[in-house]
């Protein structure tokens, strides 16, 4: 088999392939075997009819068609591998010549990963917020903990912000009752904003047994986007009494004996959260600077596939009715044109990010260990509230294990850029990224330690 590659654009190639018929013998054997199982000829047991008689029955053209259809995928893959083509997406294959007994020729056009010129990562400089742990932040955490251990007590007064109420709701749109917006005995924390917009403002000042009408725009159901008249009736009013800030509370709410020990632990927790937040900000800003400075040609077919996927997700809950989507967007003050524009921009950014990080990973020989892959799977399973075994089965059935692997590899590629970049906070202090992300030296030492342990075993 011979193959040549034509570069059609920075992101697309045409592979020209020639396959001598002598190399198709196994494909012919497979085709004849399949036909022998399907066709019964007098005097021959099933599967034993000779090739020439089978060919006489179905015609040479049908045999050639079967052989070519079976041969194309494997010969295409072989050509891609031998040429070192980094193909992405599905190819467009066209058979250009069949000389029976002599030669099969076909072409395959496919999108490829573009060549990307990477910058010197040490030239990247970003500025992030400093890690600040204030007394107010500690008190906020302590208040949240006290609220968890608070008790609710019924009160005979008007509703105030922060109270807990039991309410009945009903709504109408143009005089029509909205069934999905009708409920009785709903528990609600006033000021949380967790139910209908405008509800908190309406019930503050009401007493148990009193009602009030207000208008609100419904966000779901048959009347999504419509303005409704909502009636709320307060059934009960309760206030939350908080435990005192003392050693007794510390012993109740934690493993510590004193309030000061509890506050010290809360300070450490806040510090960990602030470090995670700062690490996220560093990653985001480094990636943003990479995307702004590095030129990445985008494969049109890959971008289009992401745009199509966004549209599919949007209409999935609307019985795949695009007119229903257009109507919903209009009711939300948007339009199909804006939706398409946003989907296009999001797809272009997503594809550019993937190609760029893959290129960085290739240049840095970034690898992903089994432990790293397992850690990511366990993290995602916990995030979705699923058992790890169930989550693994789900991603395997959806052929998404490769996507998880690629995601981990891209994350490591970005971390390698962060390691080389210059990072300061807004006060001018240099941020030690190794403390937040680790370093390549740490990873090398860990790999060496793992190898040594394996040898000891």
Swiss-Prot record:
GO CC annotations on file: cytoplasm
Biased composition (Acidic residues): 440-457
Entry keyword Chaperone: yes
Enzyme Commission number(s) from the entry: 5.2.1.8
Span of domain PPIase FKBP-type: 162-243
Main localization of the protein described in the UniProt heading: cytoplasm
Catalyzed reaction equations: [protein]-peptidylproline (omega=180) = [protein]-peptidylproline (omega=0)
GO molecular function: peptidyl-prolyl cis-trans isomerase activity; protein folding chaperone; ribosome binding
One GO BP: protein unfolding
Region annotation (Disordered) ranges: 434-457
Alphabetically ordered keywords of this record: Cell cycle, Cell division, Chaperone, Cytoplasm, Isomerase, Rotamase
Compartments it resides in: Cytoplasm
Record keyword Transcription present: no
Family per similarity comment: Belongs to the FKBP-type PPIase family. Tig subfamily.
The protein's role, per its UniProt record: Involved in protein export. Acts as a chaperone by maintaining the newly synthesized protein in an open conformation. Functions as a peptidyl-prolyl cis-trans isomerase.
The record's note on its domains: Consists of 3 domains; the N-terminus binds the ribosome, the middle domain has PPIase activity, while the C-terminus has intrinsic chaperone activity on its own.
Record NCBIfam families: tig (TIGR00115)
UniProt-recorded name of the protein: Trigger factor
